[in-house]
């Protein structure tokens, strides 16, 4: 149970705003579930709606402590006044409800500008994700990603041995939102968007698997997973584009794909972020996490 008293800052604010700002691990789902069960009291009276609260209101929230434990400890790789670099675990979205961004916003709730993500990772892809900590940094970084002045590198453990040690792949991708799937074509088609994926072979193994460094110049949904599967190199552990037989063989419970390196190759004016030019950040534990 949590006991809270509304301060002047939250006078005439909604209940969810007050509670989520003051209970950092309270998600939208948990808030509304608790509300439906009438497990919230304001000044001794149970409430079932997202009511307005006022200064000095006493609020009791009847939620078991284990449900309020912080389920996601942020693994911060680097932070300064402008950027925040986090190692995202798998099985969490970057944005949306109960997402990494939501957790970041709760932890930085006292900041005037809450850190915002500058690029995306699929839900089941772990690794480096870059947040901007102010408006100017966000504008600069979004522009740098758009113009490919920041390289995004991934480690992928795939089934198969590539015919070439290095290759730049150009194909076309169609996203079927109704099925949550994408399709790849080698030739342009109506509704398909151009994708560019490059890989370099790091190492191949006796069990017919390979470790690849993968770089993407475009950032489409499921791009790496679908593109590699399209050329006969499915990512191990990928339940959507991989091969279940091999996933079971290698006892892979999660897909073997990690965002492990960001390289800043600024070619145009980067203003307050000039100090990042020619820098790189690498997740040293990336390779170990795949095996």
Report each predicted region and the residues it spans.
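RNA pseudouridine synthases
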Residues: 1-179, 205
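Short, well-ordered beta-strand micro-motif
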Residues: 60-62, 213, 263
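Short coil/loop residues immediately preceding or within conserved phosphate-binding loops
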Residues: 71, 112, 194-197, 209-211, ...
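Short, well-ordered beta-strand segments enriched in hydrophobic/aromatic residues
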Residues: 84, 210-215
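Non-catalytic RNA-recognition surface used by pseudouridine synthases
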Residues: 168, 177, 187-203
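Short, solvent-exposed loop/beta-turn-alpha elements that line the ligand-binding surface or hinge
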Residues: 184
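Pseudouridine synthases involved in rRNA/tRNA modification
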Residues: 1-29, 33, 189-190, 202, ...
């Amino acid at each position: 149970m949590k006991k809270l008293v509304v301060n002047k800052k939250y006078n005439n604010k909604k209940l969810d705003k007050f509670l989520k700002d003051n209970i950092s691990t309270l998600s939208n789902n948990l808030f509304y579930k608790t509300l439906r069960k009438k497990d919230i009291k304001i000044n001794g009276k149970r409430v079932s709606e997202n009511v307005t609260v006022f200064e000095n209101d006493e609020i009791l929230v009847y939620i078991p402590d284990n449900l309020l434990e912080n389920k996601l400890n942020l693994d911060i790789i680097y932070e300064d006044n402008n950027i925040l670099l986090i190692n995202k675990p798998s099985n969490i979205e970057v944005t949306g409800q109960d997402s990494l961004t939501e957790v970041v916003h709760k932890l930085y709730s006292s900041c005037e500008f809450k850190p915002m993500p500058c690029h995306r990772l699929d839900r089941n892809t772990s690794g480096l994700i870059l947040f901007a900590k102010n408006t100017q940094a966000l504008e600069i970084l979004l522009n740098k990603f758009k113009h490919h002045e920041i390289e995004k590198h991934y480690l992928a453990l795939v089934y198969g041995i590539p015919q070439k040690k290095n290759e730049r792949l150009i194909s076309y991708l169609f996203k079927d939102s109704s099925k949550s799937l994408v399709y790849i074509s080698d030739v342009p088609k109506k509704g398909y968007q151009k994708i560019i994926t490059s890989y370099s072979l790091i190492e191949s193994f006796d069990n017919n698997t390979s470790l690849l460094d993968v770089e993407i110049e475009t950032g489409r949904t499921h791009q790496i997973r679908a593109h590699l599967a399209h050329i006969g190199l499915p990512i191990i552990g990928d339940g959507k584009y991989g091969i279940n037989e091999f996933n079971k063989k290698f006892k892979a419970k999660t897909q073997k794909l990690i965002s492990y390196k960001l390289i800043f190759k600024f070619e145009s004016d980067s203003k307050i972020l000039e100090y990042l030019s020619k820098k790189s950040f690498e997740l040293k534990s990336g390779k170990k996490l795949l095996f």
